[in-house]
Curated annotation (Swiss-Prot):
Keyword Cytoplasm set for record: yes
Family: Belongs to the EF-Ts family.
Localisation per UniProt entry: Cytoplasm
Keywords associated with the record: Cytoplasm, Elongation factor, Protein biosynthesis
Source organism (scientific name): Mycoplasma mobile (strain ATCC 43663 / 163K / NCTC 11711)
GO cellular component, one term: cytoplasm
Protein name: Elongation factor Ts
Primary residence: cytoplasm
Amino acid sequence: MVDAEKIKKLREMTDSGFLDCKKALEATKNDLNAAVKWLQENGKAKAAKKADRITAEGLVAAFSNDKYGVIIEINSETDFVAKNQKFKDLVNKIGQELLKHDFYKYKNIIEEVKIGNETLAELVASASATIGEKLTFRRAEQVKKFNSKQVIGVYNHFDGQKAAVLIIENGTEDMAKQLSMHITAMNPLFLDEKEVPEKEIKKLRSEFEKDEQIQLKPEKIRPKIIEGMINKKLSETTFTLQEFVVEPGQSIKQYMNSKNSFPISKIRYEVGEGIEKQVVDFASEVANQMKNKA
């Protein structure tokens, strides 16, 4: 017979459901430590069954200390789970742990870094079993300060769907935070003009040369018009050329020059970037379930 007090204790230790704890204790003859292990193994089995499900929701979050800036994305199947406090705590726990490590020392930091006895990947798999939905640790990146003049800024949008981390040189923490907020809002593709690939400029030039409206202009002035259009496009996609949302009328470059500052590196994440969300036909799904039960 299962000890009710041990069920309560096991639930407190693992956050697992009542029935799962009861099964674990039955399977291990009321041995708490063995029951914890049973739940972990069973949780991984459950996670494996969920492996083919698409995880396009979730949270992104940026963290920083006096040396590193870290940004991570952990995905879930539904936005409902993304709002779950246990899921938020998991994201925060992993982010804070990653601030202790230099990413360059690892081949696969998600599989190598541990919290307690579990790797980060195993921790997410265990949480998947507890929360009851497939979770995926999709990605993590780090920026690193190389001198005392450099400052890290992070910004997390209130909904947890967008975040950014930035390093600047010769600036304040408040300035770095405002600039990282700009990156979160405006999503620049490139840090500065030097980072814009030549193939991007060639691509834009080719597109504008084929533009019917430009073809109607006199041939002599077309190159100048095209250069102007390229510069306008780059001012929309390049961080230093964008208009600063906090100081309208000034570009980021002008603002930073006035502070004798310049950007070093940036990373921006948005939940589900590049993931094709699964579109579910509810009527068909119900019909298939009824068919399988028949």
